[in-house]
Amino acid sequence: MTDLMEVKEKLALSCRLLYREGLLDHGGLIGARIPGDSRMVLNPRTMRGTRGRHPGIMSAEDLVVVDAEGKKIDGINDPPSETPIFTGVFRKRSDVNACFHLHLRWATLFSVVGRPLVPVFHQAAVFGEVPVHQDPNLIQTDEQGRAVAETLGGARALLLRSHGTVIVGEDIESAFTASVLFEENAVRLYDASLLGEPKVLEGKERDETAKRTWNEKVISKIWNYYILKAQSEGLIS
């Protein structure tokens, strides 16, 4: 399997898994760089023959390949309107090879009320301080994409105020895992806030916890768990 085909297959699988977990809706986008290449693979604006896209049935053939500037190179579908998120982030962050733009329900709520989304769940220690990008609009221009990348800085995730999230990873598996944990932390922080004042993971404690809960072994375990879960329910073969 070529690098391009492997990226396409993993990205399409991520679409289906994220949809199964309620994390990827009709407007969410995920993309990845092809190893050793400036090209990117993205889920499309719409799926051929339709007026929309359904991540639950996304296949490798549905995905679109674009260059570093977001121009279409290959694919039966067209790039999404928010492609500048990906061109901006990938241009800024050489360590990032996968970028997910998700409209996470619980995480996004924190940007709506202006409350910091802090790590309270041990597997969310990797996020640390989460920046908030104040532009709530669709990110459709190069200028907006660059601004998102500037707000993200060296973080693993950011909140787009009243819009959604941008979550990045060294590869598709890590971006997927980070997305699951980011939303789980938001749910736990919300629930804990109903009971009292949450104890935040910070400083040395957070750093030490992140070292133990965010590594290749943990990422692989979580990625494979969701694959097996979907297989056990007959959603993927």
PLM regions: where:
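Glycine-rich flexible loops
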Residues: 1-237
